[in-house]
A protein has these predicted regions:
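Preference for long, solvent-exposed alpha-helical segments and helix-linker "stalks"
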Residues: 2-219, 223-227
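Charge-dense, extended regions
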Residues: 223, 232-239
Length: 242
């Protein structure tokens, strides 16, 4: 195979690239020499890049394959995070769903080491969920989504303080951005003990003004009641029952 790969251009045969991945993959398992192993891993990743470049019809598959090799061969969360982010950026909603989960896991590991901030982890999580939404419903996507949400919640990165610190300047800069407002309500609303703050109240109020409903009016009544703002609470209660 090595002779054929050396003599023939990548366009000679896609199977030549695929066979190379298989053969070298077996050799990687056997070798004990760290330097040789690193070179072999680099070759496998390069073969995936060549497949994506010269056989664009299979580019998505090639990059997803590369992502799997990266998570298989690299244990450094920084390498995994950086490399998977590149693949996710290219493949978007066509990325293999499990890579989104592994990318978030790497982000959380880096956060624990103070290598990245909470905002980076939250952005990684939100991007993963957005891509799964675009990809559509499937059993695989639903399971991965559940795993991603579970991992994110148990990581405790999305503390109320972190969310408020992240979203307050965004809201102040663009208070009429309904996508942002909806996101704030969703994120803070699903975080335990994160509904009794001005950011959440302002976002819910903005959503209600944009799309008034009896349920949102009643929710605002409850929020203002909790803050002992009786006059405003009564106003929303009357709106809810009218």
């Amino acid at each position: 195979w090595r002779k054929a790969f050396k003599l023939c251009p990548p366009t000679a045969s896609q199977n030549m690239l695929l066979n190379g991945m298989t053969l070298i993959g077996k050799e990687i398992v056997k070798t004990k020499d760290a330097q040789v192993r690193a070179a072999m891993i680099d070759t496998v990743l390069t073969l995936n890049d060549l497949r994506a470049e010269y056989y664009p019809k299979y580019a998505v598959t090639a990059y997803n394959s590369k992502g799997q090799y990266i998570t298989q061969y690299f244990k450094d969360p920084q390498v995994v995070y950086d490399q998977l982010n590149k693949i996710i950026e290219i493949n978007q909603e066509k990325v293999k769903p499990s890579l989104l989960l592994l990318d978030l896991n790497a982000a959380i590991e880096l956060y624990k080491k103070s290598a990245i901030g909470a905002e980076d982890v939250i952005n990684t999580y939100q991007n993963a969920i957005a891509l799964l939404d675009k990809a559509g419903n499937s059993d695989d996507n639903a399971k991965i989504r559940s795993d991603i949400e579970g991992l994110f919640i148990t990581s405790q990165v999305a503390s109320c303080d972190n969310l408020i610190a992240l979203f307050t300047p965004r809201y102040e800069a663009d208070p009429d951005n309904m996508d942002l407002v909806t996101n704030i309500v969703k994120m803070l609303g699903s975080t335990e003990g994160c509904q009794n703050n001005d950011l959440f109240l302002n976002a819910v109020t903005k959503m209600h003004k944009n799309e008034p409903s009896a349920s949102s009016a009643y929710y605002l009544y409850k929020l203002h009641s909790a803050k002992d703002e009786s006059e405003t609470a009564i106003k929303y209660f009357e709106e809810a029952v009218s």
